[in-house]
Amino acid sequence: MANIERDSCRFKAIQGADGKFVVRMKMFHKTVSLLADATVDFELLNGTTADQARKLAESMNDRVTGVLINKA
């Protein structure tokens, strides 16, 4: 039987050192052991503007309630 770990999260658009935008996932409670000390960034397509990245992060915050990790 699989072991499922879950946590609430939120997303924020940030600009990386290379100038490209990413959406960063922040965990609320650090209850997912695999992600407790990790940073999870979602790479965006080249040419994504700051406004597009911000709107995407806002949309994700409106629709995503958490993260599930399924460990076999």
Locate the predicted segments by residue.
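Short N-terminal "domain-start" leader segments
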Residues: 1-33
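A short, charged, amphipathic alpha-helix used as a generic interaction element across diverse proteins
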Residues: 36-71
